[in-house]
Amino acid sequence: MNQDHPECDSEELTQNSPETDPLKVEVETLRGEIASIKADVLRERAELENQRKRLIRDVEQARKFANEKLLGELLPVFDSLDAGLTASGSEPSPLRDGLELTYKQLLKVATDNGLMLLDPVGQLFNPEHHQAISQTEVTDVEPGYVIQVFQKGYLLNERLLRPALVVVAKQD
């Protein structure tokens, strides 16, 4: 620096000021790019984590409901076994005992795989699980309660597989 000529110093300062120093400009530009890249990396990590969680949830749902088609196709078999037990009466016989044992074993296997039987006699009508096919006037039952089940309903892992077909009590 020249103390005798201050105008020279201001010229040098202007050339080396932060606004015009190419290195400082480049450093600031690179810092901005680094910050942008860091933000992009964080967004990508968050997206990957969300995809991983979605995949885990989808696999869990697929596993939970993989038997839905098979169990749905077994419902008529349950209906037939139930009808056979009803038709055989209440008197014990080897045929009735065998039919009942088969029904219970099949139902146990199905319940172990998430199937739940809906037999709502005496319960309040629930439109999410029951389908009313008629209403009947009854004096000894509160209105809105199920008094007869024509066809049992089923849930699979708390999701409706088939509604129960029911008769509901109504007011006189």
Swiss-Prot record:
Q: Which Gene3D superfamilies match?
A: 3.90.20.20, Head domain of nucleotide exchange factor GrpE
GO MF terms on file?
adenyl-nucleotide exchange factor activity; protein homodimerization activity; protein-folding chaperone binding; unfolded protein binding
Sorted alphabetically, the keyword list is:
Chaperone, Cytoplasm, Stress response
**Which SUPFAM superfamilies does the UniProt record give?**
Coiled-coil domain of nucleotide exchange factor GrpE, Head domain of nucleotide exchange factor GrpE
* GO aspect biological process, one term: protein folding
- Residue numbers spanned by region Disordered: 1-23
Q: Which family does it belong to?
A: Belongs to the GrpE family.
Record protein name field: Protein GrpE
